[in-house]
């Protein structure tokens, strides 16, 4: 079982080094904030430690256990089954491609049916 409880945002990465010195590329999205020292930095994205050191990203073969919230931005591909015990809350769109089976009950989602019919 692999426990997912944090996130590695990385360090100084290629996008930050190649981006302009200030503005959107320097201290903003791909500079010292989100890209260079953040999400796409040394650990996670297109940086150096990702391919060389295998940074933590909550992926692997086996089971993944999540306690708390697991926010996901971007695309997440899941191959296999995802059994869920408890409640799942989607804020926004939840697009699914392929075959999706959902078993559960309508428990006050706001649709007005109030049905206990399993679907």
From Swiss-Prot:
Residues 54-102 are annotated as: Central domain. Sequence repeats lie at residues 28-32, 33-37, 38-42, 43-47. Residues 1-6 form the signal peptide. Keywords: Repeat, Signal. Residues 7-53 are annotated as: Left arm. Residues 103-119 are annotated as: Right arm. The keyword Glycoprotein does not apply. Belongs to the chorion protein family. This protein is one of many from the eggshell of the silk moth. This is Chorion class A protein PC292. The lineage of its organism: Eukaryota, Metazoa, Ecdysozoa, Arthropoda, Hexapoda.
């Amino acid at each position: 079982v692999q426990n997912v409880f944090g996130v590695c945002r990385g360090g100084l990465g290629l996008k930050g080094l190649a981006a302009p010195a200030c503005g959107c590329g320097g201290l903003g999205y791909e500079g010292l904030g989100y890209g260079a020292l953040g999400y796409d930095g040394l650990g996670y994205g297109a940086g150096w430690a990702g391919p060389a050191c295998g940074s933590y990203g909550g992926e692997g073969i086996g089971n993944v256990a999540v306690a708390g919230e697991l926010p996901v931005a971007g695309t997440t591909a899941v191959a296999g089954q995802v059994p869920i015990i408890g409640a799942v809350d989607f804020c926004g769109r939840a697009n699914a491609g392929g075959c999706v089976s959902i078993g559960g009950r309508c428990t006050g989602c706001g649709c007005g049916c109030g049905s206990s019919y399993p679907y």
